[in-house]
From Swiss-Prot:
Protein name, entry field: SNRPN upstream reading frame protein
Source species: Homo sapiens (Human)
Similarity remark: Belongs to the SNURF family.
InterPro entries: SNURF
GO terms for cellular component: nuclear speck; nucleus
Keyword Nucleus attached: yes
Any one Gene Ontology molecular-function term assigned to this protein's record: ATPase binding
Main location: nucleus
Cellular localization per UniProt: Nucleus
Amino acid sequence: MERARDRLHLRRTTEQHVPEVEVQVKRRRTASLSNQECQLYPRRSQQQQVPVVDFQAELRQAFLAETPRGG
């Protein structure tokens, strides 16, 4: 019984400590990635590219809504 308790205790302590380290690593990675992306691609190009896709989708929906079905 004592061994089982020790295993459970070890499991709980490791589960508590490991995610904190993972979160810190993920934050560092995302921060470094965002910095690299800002340097590689200027924000103007990103802002211009994204609305075009939405605009095309809106046009397609409006066109499908206006065209009579079956005809």
